[in-house]
Amino acid sequence: NRLDDYQWKNRLILVQAASENGGEIETLRSARAEIDDRDIVWFVNTGSDVVSNQKAVSGSLESDIKAVLDESRSYGRVLLIGKDGGIKSRESSLDLDAIFRRIDGMPMRIREMRAD
């Protein structure tokens, strides 16, 4: 599968980790309920591997993730991609509270919350 396969289904958080044990993976895993509630799929590029809350990351998907993170490297290490496929924010560090606030202010998310 490819990054495009998530469009209109999931919001994506892509993280270029500072190191293999930089804490980003644990931060994301500890917020599982909030992440699942917002239809978020996350990927952390540790340099040697891509870790995700998905079962498996194919070679083509890993290539897509690394390419997008490489293109945005000068703008930030953390990308939020909306369900429409557009980049919604680029940050220098992973701040889940800020990401959740940004998502919760998006029109599509507001409609989802009303429907629940």
For each predicted feature, which ranges?
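Non-catalytic interaction/Regulatory regions outside core domains
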Residues: N1-D116
